[in-house]
Amino acid sequence: MSFLKKSLLLILFLGLVSLSVCKEEKRETEEENENEENHEEGSEMKRYMFHLMDGEAKKRDSEENEIEENHEEGSEMKRYAFGYPSGEAKKIKRVSEEENENEENHEEGSEMKRYAFGYPSGEAKKIKRESEEEKEIEENHEEGSEMKRYAFGYPSGEAKKIKRESEEENENEENHEEGSEMKRYAFGYPSGEAKKM
């Protein structure tokens, strides 16, 4: 029985608390509504005092907006007529300049990092890549030339080099023999021909 009484008292107490909370919320809501109504009445009085009726104020705002739009259209026409960039073009130009500046700063930062850690710069990589490409192109050209020579029966670069070296050796040998002949004649030694006789 005691338990039943305690639970009923607890329920009754909670009901009273919730009722008082609801009354407090209702009173606060009524006060807020009253304050809002007073504010609206005050605003209406101010508008009436300063001759700014709702319709008149809206009319003025629309006229001001129309004047501003006409001014912007006129400015746009002037820019177009005299070749000046519009606000949008200026914005695009400014954005591209900022992107270029950011890219330059990034490249400078990357260059500093490469320098600090001993990595080659983009320019060095580019030069290295170009030289490798040139070597590859030259090798491909040489291979193509070698195939053509083989196909058409022309001597290859190596064969030409060997032939040229043997011709140079023969020429050097002839020059040496002529020089030796001149020396022998100048100093009175018999030549190889004279020795044979």
Curated annotation (Swiss-Prot):
It comes from the Eukaryota. This is Dermorphin-1. Residues 30-39, 167-176 have a biased composition (Acidic residues). GO terms for cellular component: extracellular region. The keyword Signal applies. Expressed by the skin glands. The modification D-methionine is found at residue 49. It comes from Phyllomedusa sauvagei (Sauvage's leaf frog).
